[in-house]
Amino acid sequence: MLTNTERVKVLSDVTILQKFSSRIIVIKYGGAAMKNQKLKDHVISDLVFLSFIGLRPILVHGGGPEINFWLDQLKILPKFENGVRVTDQPTMDIVEMVLVGRVNKDLVASINKQGGKSVGLSGKDGLLITSRPSDKPNLGFVGEVQNVDTNLLEILINNNYIPVIASVAADKQGQSYNINADTVAGEIAARLNAEKLILLTDTPGILRNASDATTLISHLSIQEARDLTKTAVISGGMIPKVNCCIRSLAQGVASAHILDGRIDHALLLEILTDQGIGSMLVV
């Protein structure tokens, strides 16, 4: 939790309150910040604090480690292709039970415990997300976002609730799909014209040298990000995250951020300080 001194400092900065009052921020939550209880507590307290000072946060989550744990308990061997979980029907059943029934409700309870008001959802609720199959049929029930309906989200955030969304949705026939949580967050941010899309990761951000954290690129445009991808400065698992940011920016999101979720209070440091701590992408 923030100290009283830190809270007073933020709350006394009228420019911050004016700048962000009623603005929507969509946060994709994953990585070490989900596995480490101390980091988890900090993320939750940051969310609640941001809602207290007038922002309207929305949390989107996956839950890979928890899924793997329960697959192991049920003697189901996880399979991956190029880092993407191959999702047959038994795996899809576990994914949905774990993300919607366990991880999501644990996050909701944690937010409520720290003084916020939260509602847990999946993409199925209120037709929030309509899915379609991935263009890679060998991945099984891995889906893409076909449509986003934000009516339910708008009702919730306009009444000071913090929506927590599991990245599971269904197609028009009712078949469940496992969708990348970055993608879900980006599409929701775009549809809501969010002020910020924030991806919490296990890296400092976009680095010129992947092995040197001091080479962090703190600010870049869409074109600069594309150029860095062409020259392989942006590579591997960072490519889909950057592409997600680019898509959301192209659809009206004001800024997209890739942060190190292993840093205490990473959200507040990025949003409420001039220098930030991660990589910010803008149009």
UniProtKB/Swiss-Prot annotation:
It is found in: Plastid, Chloroplast. It holds the Pfam family AA_kinase. Coiled coil: none annotated. The record marks 28, 241 as: Transition state stabilizer. One of its GO terms (biological process) is L-arginine biosynthetic process. Keywords: Amino-acid biosynthesis, Arginine biosynthesis, ATP-binding, Chloroplast, Kinase, Nucleotide-binding, Plastid, Transferase. Its EC number is 2.7.2.8. Substrate binds at residues 63-64, 85, 178. It is an enzyme of class 2 (transferase). GO terms for cellular component: chloroplast. It comes from the Eukaryota. CDD domains: AAK_NAGK-C (cd04250). Catalyzes the ATP-dependent phosphorylation of N-acetyl-L-glutamate. PANTHER family: N-ACETYLGLUTAMATE SYNTHASE, N-ACETYLGLUTAMATE SYNTHASE, MITOCHONDRIAL. This is Acetylglutamate kinase. It comes from Porphyra purpurea.
